[in-house]
Curated annotation (Swiss-Prot):
Family to which this protein belongs: Belongs to the beta-defensin family.
Keyword tags: Antibiotic, Antimicrobial, Defensin, Disulfide bond, Membrane, Secreted, Signal
Official protein name in the record: Beta-defensin 106
Residue stretches in coiled coil: none
GO molecular function, one term: heparin binding
Record lineage: Eukaryota, Metazoa, Chordata, Craniata, Vertebrata
Keyword Disulfide bond: yes
Gene3D superfamilies: Antimicrobial Peptide, Beta-defensin 2, Chain A
Amino acid sequence: MRTFLFLFAVLFFLTPAKNAFFDEKCNKLKGTCKNNCGKNEELIALCQKSLKCCRTIQPCGSIID
């Protein structure tokens, strides 16, 4: 019975993992379509379904295209 309660508590409080593999890509596969861009991301385009194309901001010293 204790094992069941322990497993229930562990599984109940675990957050579901996000699978980024199936996310919609944009800007030549360098950005992702989201509802809102994160703190370290910039809005670069608009996606379908009123989503925003967000791309991680690169530091000034490492510009890669």
